Swiss-Prot record:
This is ATP synthase epsilon chain. Gene3D superfamilies: ATP synthase delta/epsilon subunit, C-terminal domain (1.20.5.440), F0F1 ATP synthase delta/epsilon subunit, N-terminal (2.60.15.10). The keyword Magnesium does not apply. F-type ATPases have 2 components, CF(1) - the catalytic core - and CF(0) - the membrane proton channel. CF(1) has five subunits: alpha(3), beta(3), gamma(1), delta(1), epsilon(1). CF(0) has three main subunits: a, b and c. It is a peripheral membrane protein. Keywords: ATP synthesis, Cell membrane, CF(1), Hydrogen ion transport, Ion transport, Membrane, Transport. One of its GO terms (cellular component) is plasma membrane. CDD domains: F1-ATPase_delta (cd12152).
Amino acid sequence: MGSLNVSIVTPDGPVYEGVAQMVIARTKAGELGILPGHVPLVAPLKIDIVRLKVESGEEWVAVGGGFMEVNGEEVNILADTAEREQDIDIDRAEKAKQRAEAELSRAKEQKVDEVMAQLALQKAINRIHAKEHS
């Protein structure tokens, strides 16, 4: 089986650069599994885990939305935010989840930006889920 050159970058810089046998990501249209030789595509990503099948097993990266581009043996992910599972501080993620839940509760009561509070909560839960995998 061939391999894919994978790059995950955010506005703050690169998060992952490496080789994988498969990339699994959740797009707005559903979950996609990318293998070497996949047809070219560009797809918007949801807040979720990107799973990378590598020789040593599987690596998880929590992404906060963005886009995935597949071209030949290259997979480039341009993420709004991204953290590798080993880089996630679980205490910080739990506190972010608590803040987001409080903000969401306040948003419902005061009719303020509920969408932003929902996004913050989704990102915090996603980070916790990725860290629990390690």
